[in-house]
Amino acid sequence: MAVAPLNKFLTIAVPVAPGEQTVYTAPTGSSAIVLYAQVSNVGIGETYPTVTFTHRRKSTSQRTNGNTRNNRIIKGAEIPPNDSLIIIDGRLVLERTAVAIDSIVIEGTQSGIVAISTCQYTDTTGITTVTTSVPHNFNAGDEVTMSGLAFTCASGNYGITTTIFPSPQQSFTIDSIIGSVGTSKTFVTNAGISSGIPHTYVSGGLVGPLQMEFICSILENSTT
């Protein structure tokens, strides 16, 4: 007896954080169709960020396991102030088979990105104090995105699958800065409570003003 496919519509809406982000991977036992994808310039003032949108296929076959092929749908497309770029308005099929895994990846380039030198995170309150290598030029109330901060966590079976925290697929509001605008290298935000799991900063990380937001609509087709 044939199994009727189960269809599910998804909407993914995330900020475009510094660096590369995998925003969606086709789940096991299904294929997916990207129906629509758009990036908007939500920056304050005259900003001209660019975005690259990639269809990534990773091999899982025995002979070529781990090989990756990047098919760039668009590369380095500039988005003017208060405007948006429609990347897909039709369909892009993503597969998950015994020999391949498909993902969609975005990478933004923008002004105002600075490197993070230290970060202190309190798991019980979510309060996060970030120090940058050079003055960050942020004000209290600004929205920022962060990516690539590596942490270690206390031992225990918490179901943690990554050492990167916080998630790059959300933005954060700056609660306060330490020092004066233009010379301050430290700001305070809230990255959310982590259910009593202590985090210790190791290295890395980038932070920048929120300038782009990505949204896409996906239809998943499952037979499992």
Protein language model annotation of sequence segments:
Residues 12-14, 21-24, 74-79, 87, ...:
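Generic detection of short hydrophobic beta-strand segments and adjacent strand-loop junctions
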Residues 44-70, 110-123:
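Short beta-strand/loop turn elements enriched in aromatics
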Residues 110-214, 221-224:
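Small/polar beta-strand repeat architecture
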Residues 32-36, 84-86, 127-129, 186:
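Intrinsic-disorder/low-complexity, polar/charged segments enriched in Ser/Thr/Lys/Arg/Asp/Glu/Gln
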Residues 40-43, 95-96, 175-177:
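Short linear motifs in intrinsically disordered
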Residues 56-109:
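Intrinsically disordered, low-complexity Pro/Gly/Ser/Thr-rich segments with frequent PxxP/GP/PP motifs
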Residues 1-32, 36, 40-44, 49, ...:
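C-terminal interaction-tip segments
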